[in-house]
Amino acid sequence: MRIINAEGLILGRLASKVAKMLLEGEEVVIVNAEKAVITGNRDVIFKKYKQRTELRTLTNPRRGPFYPKRSDEIVRRTIRGMLPWKTDRGRKAFKRLKVYVGIPKEFQGKELETIIEAHVSRLSRPKYVTVGEVAKFLGGKF
């Protein structure tokens, strides 16, 4: 089991690395999901996520698609998009993923990994928004 601290990591790069780990059969736990960052212009990011959450079908709006508003679910959905979700292999890989806001008691004191290639300090222009800020904008709890 790998415990990854998402604090200061770029969401897309984190998601691609984690998706690869899941497909290789590893169990992955991500903590501090609300502190992961999405790079780009703040207004454009907020507009994109707002449009996603308001998507509905005209025939029956209860059918979806449904996009999350909580920060841990936003991270899970991003990783799901990088897995072959419609195959049995992709669904089994997705079940091996756990995402948490903050650090739960069961993982406190354990060694947390980070992904150096995905760290925000590698950006040339530090324009980003945290996943927690996006979730708060969408009306999520965390």
From Swiss-Prot:
GO terms for cellular component: cytosolic large ribosomal subunit
Domain of life: Archaea
Alphabetical list of Pfam families matching this protein: Ribosomal_L13
SUPFAM superfamilies: Ribosomal protein L13
Keyword Transit peptide applies: no
Metal-binding among keywords: no
Binding partners and assembly: Part of the 50S ribosomal subunit.
Protein name: Large ribosomal subunit protein uL13
The species this protein was found in: Pyrococcus furiosus (strain ATCC 43587 / DSM 3638 / JCM 8422 / Vc1)
Annotated gene: rpl13
